[in-house]
Amino acid sequence: MPTVALEHPEAGPRSASPARGRAYWACTLFVALTALGAGVMDILHLQPLFGLLLHLGYPPYFATLLGGWKILGAIVLLAPRYPLVKEWAYAGMIIDYSSAVVSHWACGDAATALVGPMVSIAALVGSWYLRPQPRRLPRSIV
């Protein structure tokens, strides 16, 4: 007797596997909690992040602006629905972390200063790649 697949046609292979779901949430929680903590530190101008921004040549008000966007991005990644807003959050965080890598490199910082933003980029890409179907844009938009 033939079997009938009950998966959504756009879901892709093994989209609902438990391991994939756990990996998605591990990456997403890492990114969201890191962004939330860094956002609070930026808004409150707390060390070491505030001193680091000044060292990289950014003005003090930039920390407040960046912190607000980090907090909003973390909330959006954790909230259900709104896949288009999530795509913007992912894009903003990629810009933030890749800018951190370039800023450290341009200031002549040690290679170890690049590790944190690069780990965040890897977790962010993992979160984006592993996100479940309800958190993705419909194929008609992409």
Task: Give residue spans per PLM region.
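Membrane-interface extramembranous regions
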Residues: 2-142
